[in-house]
Regions:
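Sec-dependent signal peptide recognition
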Residues: 1-9
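N-terminal signal peptide c-region/cleavage motif recognized by signal peptidases
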Residues: 11-13
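Boundary of Sec targeting at the N-terminus
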Residues: 15-18
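Amphipathic alpha-helical packing elements
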Residues: 23-54
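Compact alpha-helical subdomains of small soluble proteins
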Residues: 47-100
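C-terminal partner/receptor-binding element of secreted or periplasmic proteins
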Residues: 82-95, 171-186
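Beta-loop motif signature
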Residues: 98-151
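SH3/SH3-like beta-barrel superfamily modules
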Residues: 131-180
């Protein structure tokens, strides 16, 4: 089990070179996109396009500004080449559907072999948010993003992998530990 845990973490995005910086770049620019920003870089245009854009100087809400500050703090030291046209984010298609974008944390943990019951993975931090997937028994769950407080609960953005291959992701209120995981990592 310990060897499997090490393989699981080594195959996760935190060890994938610039994957963490790619995630943070996407989240930061998705905030601007949501505020009507018009992108000029090839990367911004490839990921967000400019349809419906309104400005190069968007006015952010207080919530957007606060989230942007958190992303920028996490992004310190990251360098992204804006002439690229893609990012190393395995769950990019899912992130495009999220109502709350996750912010990558500096650490990660894993639940190897989920023993809890089925659990909805949602687009946002509310039980009324759309269910994207269901966490199932035996899933290998990666926790590598900051938790969010919403509705008096703690929500985690979790990613599910199978032999190092990304399978599904979403937001959930999830209590995890030895009682609901075959093994723990991180």
């Amino acid at each position: 089990m310990r060897i499997y845990a090490l393989v699981f973490l080594a195959a996760s995005p935190a060890f994938a070179g610039d994957g963490t910086c790619d995630e943070l770049w996407f989240t930061r620019n998705a905030i601007f996109h949501g505020a009507g920003y018009c992108f000029s870089s090839p990367l911004g245009q490839a990921l967000f396009g400019n349809e419906g854009c309104t400005t190069k100087s968007p006015e952010l809400t207080a919530a957007q500004s606060a989230r942007l500050d958190r992303v920028k703090a996490a992004e310190e030291g990251c360098v992204i080449d804006p002439s690229r046209t893609s990012l190393d984010i395995p769950d990019l298609a899912i992130r495009r559907r999220l109502t709350v974008l996750p912010i990558r944390s500096e650490s990660e943990s894993g639940c190897i072999g989920w023993k809890g019951g089925p659990l909805s993975l949602r687009t946002g931090t509310s039980h009324s948010a759309e269910t994207l997937f269901t966490l199932e028994p035996d899933d290998v769950v990666l926790f590598s993003h900051e938790s969010e407080q919403a509705g008096g609960e703690v929500w985690d953005y979790v990613q599910v992998y199978d032999n190092g291959v990304f399978r599904k992701a979403g937001w959930a209120v999830i209590d995890w530990g030895p009682e609901v995981c075959e093994g723990l990592a991180g």
